[in-house]
């Protein structure tokens, strides 16, 4: 009815579809983040994944809305200041200060475990799981990968020279979602520490460590999972190994970082959005591209090296959070 009256006053014959197409084209032309674009287009979080993973201040959404109306010669209704406060979207985004405190407490606990007296220090099996957990944490906050079985694949899925890792964390619409994403400086250092540890482990000749030794050899050759847990029996002895799964990650993290399994995806995307990173880079990292608009599709002029814009931002973020590499401590 409103559109019909507007057409009558202006002598036009615009349809709702035409208005929607214009809005979509304007948002794309202006390079508006896909989360904000989804909100302005009236989509639900189930229809627009970036909305679900982004913590967006209301004032930012309203600012874009006013720009859009101004492009058509219109003005928005002035809202009371309190109505522009707060945020929409993800509720799993801790602020930088809160996350830094949480990670600080976790790393303080980790250092205490590793620097205590010989009687208090972890066994090799316990150390192994501490190292796997820390490696996962750093890779999570670098790649924003979805929690899946055999997390981060195998050794051949990444290259420390080119600083890229291949993620295969979701298959949908009969089209592979495999993608190359850049590794942050901290992720490269942690993977180097993990490889050194695997090499150390593969050289062990203690019969009781045979399951770990075998898994390390498989990981180094690329024939087995890169990351795996050590499973302890009730008496504390090594029982075997277990590949990394979403459920096993929850068990290992819940006592120290009691957050949802995919909290890191919310945190990474929200931080990149806050820092003004282009939406095409963010969506390429999280695997949120729409079909036909992929970052590296055949009609794109983008280069993979452009994605290092992401690591420039993430490296500074990791420094602010106080994240450190684990793997340089003496193994007992």
Each model region followed by its residue ranges:
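Acidic/polar, glycine-enriched structural segments that form the non-catalytic walls/loops
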Residues: 73-80
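Short, charged phosphate-coordinating catalytic segments
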Residues: 34-39, 133-165, 277-284
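Catalytic-site neighborhood detector that most strongly recognizes the C-terminal catalytic loop/helix
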Residues: 41-73, 88-100, 285-329
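Short, flexible loop/turn elements at secondary-structure junctions
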Residues: 31, 44, 57, 141-143, ...
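Active-site/catalytic core of tyrosine-dependent DNA strand-transfer enzymes
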Residues: 1-12, 91, 95-111, 115, ...
């Amino acid at each position: 009815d409103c559109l019909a009256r507007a057409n009558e006053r202006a002598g036009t014959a615009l349809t709702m579809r035409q208005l929607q197409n214009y809005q979509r084209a304007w948002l794309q032309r202006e390079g508006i983040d896909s989360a904000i674009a989804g909100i302005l287009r009236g989509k639900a979080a189930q229809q627009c994944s970036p909305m679900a993973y982004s913590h967006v201040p209301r004032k930012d959404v309203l600012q874009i809305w006013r720009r859009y109306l101004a492009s058509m010669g219109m003005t928005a209704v002035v809202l009371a200041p309190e109505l522009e406060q707060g945020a929409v979207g993800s509720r799993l985004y801790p602020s930088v200060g809160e996350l830094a405190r949480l990670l600080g407490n976790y790393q303080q606990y980790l250092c205490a475990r590793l620097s205590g007296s010989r009687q208090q220090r972890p066994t090799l099996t316990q150390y192994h799981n501490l190292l796997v957990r820390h490696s996962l944490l750093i890779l999570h906050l670098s790649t924003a990968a979805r929690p899946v079985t055999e997390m981060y694949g195998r050794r051949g899925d990444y290259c420390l020279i080119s600083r890229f890792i291949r993620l295969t964390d979701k298959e949908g619409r009969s089209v592979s979602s495999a993608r190359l994403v850049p590794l942050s400086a901290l992720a490269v250092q942690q993977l180097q520490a993990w490889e050194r540890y695997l090499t150390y482990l593969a050289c062990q000749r203690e019969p009781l460590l045979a399951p770990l030794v075998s898994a390390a050899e498989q990981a180094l050759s690329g024939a087995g999972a890169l990351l795996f847990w050590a499973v302890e029996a009730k008496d504390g002895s090594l029982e075997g190994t277990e590949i990394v799964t979403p459920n096993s990650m929850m068990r290992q993290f819940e006592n120290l970082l009691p957050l949802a399994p995919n909290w890191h995806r919310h945190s990474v995307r929200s931080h990149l959005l806050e820092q003004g990173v282009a939406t095409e880079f963010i969506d390429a990292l999280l695997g949120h591209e729409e079909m036909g608009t992929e970052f590296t599709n055949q009609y794109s002029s983008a280069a993979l090296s452009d994605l290092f814009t992401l690591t420039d931002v993430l490296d500074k973020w990791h420094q602010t959070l106080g994240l450190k590499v684990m793997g340089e401590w003496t193994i007992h």
